[in-house]
Amino acid sequence: MRKIIHVDMDCFYAAIEMRDNPRLRDIPLAIGGSADRRGVISTANYPARRYGVRSAMATATALRLCPHLTLLPGRMEVYKSTSRQIREIFSRYTSLIEPLSLDEAYLDVTDSPHCNGSATRIAEEIRRTIADELNLTASAGIAPIKFLAKVASELNKPNGQYVITPEQVDDFLLALPLEKIPGVGKVTAKRLEERGLHTCADVRVYALADLLKAFGKFGRVLWERCQGIDDRQISPDRQRKSVGVEKTLAQDIHNWDQCENLIEQLYQELEVRLKRVKPDLHIARQGVKLKFDDFQQTTQEHVWPMLNKQDLLKLAQQTWQERRKSRGVRLVGLHVTLLDPQIERQLVFDWG
């Protein structure tokens, strides 16, 4: 049985700013772009979250919720440097580290000799070391499989950890609400509820064929997760190839203005997600996806060197006009393809 730890730093960017400027600690604080430039929030500290301020929220909305919010533009080089320090701490315990972003990673400590092989104690030691050496807090989840480790890391935030032992997996899953499973958003959760599916226990007695019919490939993933199946390995050399966001609509849309408004919202979330893995926003391509009311879908991409909202809007409108054919649209998505690391290094060499 594997021993997987998911480590998630607590409001990482904001925590670094509070560490470096203690006067910021007890006031609502967010990192993001300015409201007059249609900026978006990257992260917020816990005092700001009490006012409803969240990541991927428009800065203007955040300031309406919390007029006395302190807004900082962020220091990406500092965040990247700190992330490297955190990864070095991880490497003291295992070489099997899979970074998900600057502030989040999976660790496989199955064969680690540290702490007499106790994943719980390794997680405690890692969190304590991060606090002692970097003056930052981290939360952790410990479980035999990846997705449960990620779920567990959310259960005792901030500055805590939660353990799901192999013996506890089945009971934990039976009671787990489906919206807690990564990949189950609000619309999917509602569609599941309409079928009487609220927890993993409900899915276990539901026909796999019906899940596949209703949810496609994700139906199988959902069924497997509810059975406690997640065979994904920790991939230390894994290079993220793309970043995307999409939204399944409760009701189909039929006019471009509705689609344009949705893309404006999705773009803000895409920008936040991309900054976590590629702070300079350099990319290889960006694209749009539309899924129609007959469940057919289309994707169009455009070679572009940097995330660009106007280009995405133009591409989306072209896709809408050329491929919709009067059909309703039930899903809108945006995505970027990242530069191959070898190509990116060559560009730096050629032009640096």
From Swiss-Prot:
GO terms for cellular component: cytosol. The active site is at E104. Monomer. Coiled coil: none annotated. It comes from Pectobacterium atrosepticum (strain SCRI 1043 / ATCC BAA-672). Keywords: Cytoplasm, DNA damage, DNA repair, DNA replication, DNA-binding, DNA-directed DNA polymerase, Magnesium, Metal-binding, Mutator protein, Nucleotidyltransferase, Transferase. PROSITE patterns: UMUC. GO terms for molecular function: damaged DNA binding; DNA-directed DNA polymerase activity; magnesium ion binding. The gene is dinB. This is DNA polymerase IV.
